[in-house]
Amino acid sequence: MVFLKIPGVNNGHPITVKEIIRIQAISNYSRIYFTNGKVIVVAKVLHWFEDSLPETMFARVHRSHLVNKSFVEKIKGTRSKSLVLYNGDSIAISRRRRVLIG
């Protein structure tokens, strides 16, 4: 099991990475969406998460989104593609990142 320790979050206890659905950038903060429906905002940039999380589990699909690959249900669209996650969230895939996703 893979864990991530985020300073100031969860009383300093590590978070189980497989419980993170996606992370959204909000300026110098990031919004983390969890499988239990919980959403938290942390004072870390998305790049920090990209460097801290395993590449095999997470993909940067847009300038403002990092998604857990295991929660991707499908890719939709022909010209402008987007990911549909298991919880129904739809996230645009940037043109630059489409090649990496498929």
How would you name each of these model-derived features?
Residues 1-102:
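Basic, polyanion-interacting recognition surfaces, primarily
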